[in-house]
Amino acid sequence: MLQGIIDIGSNTIRMAVYLIEGNHFEQLMKRKATVGLASYVKEGVMQPEGIERAVETLLEYKRFLHCFKINRVAAFTTAALRNAKNSREAVEAIEERTGIKIQVISGDEEATFDFIGATHNLQNDSGLLIDIGGGSTEIVTYRDRQIQYKTSLPIGSLSFASKYVKDVLPTMQECMEMHGEAEATIAAASDFISISEAEIVGIGGTFKGACALNNELFNLPAANRRLETKNIRSIIGNFVSDLGMTQEMSITLMRSVPERLNTIIPGLIIASVLSRRFQSHWITYSDSGVREGYIYDQIMGK
């Protein structure tokens, strides 16, 4: 059967079509719209403009799915709508105008779906999974392919960019402010205090962008998905706006992460703090995550 999945995130709204046959599925195509819903949250309230952007994008996806007679559609939303004070009202407004039922998944559920999707085809049985989203960061530790701890932190690449960064790229002072909040938030996650030297499986746009920049800057193959954590601070330093960024670095940034120019450095700051907090030396990027985990758990698992 053909199954449409719509993931309404804080930074992007993604739609993918999967062919599901028995216990296996294949992604046939995907689309992405960089909407930046988290930037429409003012004083904790999702603004009408954000609702309008979500409606426009979902109606576009709905027309596409209808064209190919894909009637099975599941939509879910994460931090931007989940954490808004008017979450229920905003979701109901979007549902009413689009005819698409939206499931608001909790931070705990998001972390679980991340884990299921990202680790299904990986060889390492134990480690640390991190998903730095636009409005939240999910962390899961696992051993023998079983979840040990999981949490969702209220920090993300777009929320940091909106809160701290005045222009497109941050200044050194803005980087320090983001670093301080990331450290304080992560330090409060006491369940993880004893974990160290765990290899990180990273999912989401921040880690995808980190690998692209790492490969470009360190002359590695474009297909490489492994990143030494010691390189992250060096990568950040190349793109701080008041440290004399060169034209060569501007070209590298635009070539590697054209759709994440304003969020990649805030996301990398969170990644840097996490990797040092857990004394991790390596990150492996996985392009499977919450959508694939949702299929395994909510569609194939039922």
Model regions and ranges:
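Gly/Thr-rich phosphate-binding beta-strand-loop-beta motif of the actin/hexokinase/Hsp70
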Residues: M1-F25, A118, N124-L153, G205, ...
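Short acidic/polar active-site loop segments enriched in Thr and Asp
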Residues: N11, N71, H281
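N-terminal capping/interface segment
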Residues: I13, H66-C67
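N-terminal glycine-rich anion-binding loops that anchor highly charged ligand groups
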Residues: H24-K32, C67-F68
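Helical "lid/coupling" subdomains associated with nucleotide-phosphate turnover
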Residues: Y40-F64, T78-A90, E96-H120, N124-S126, ...
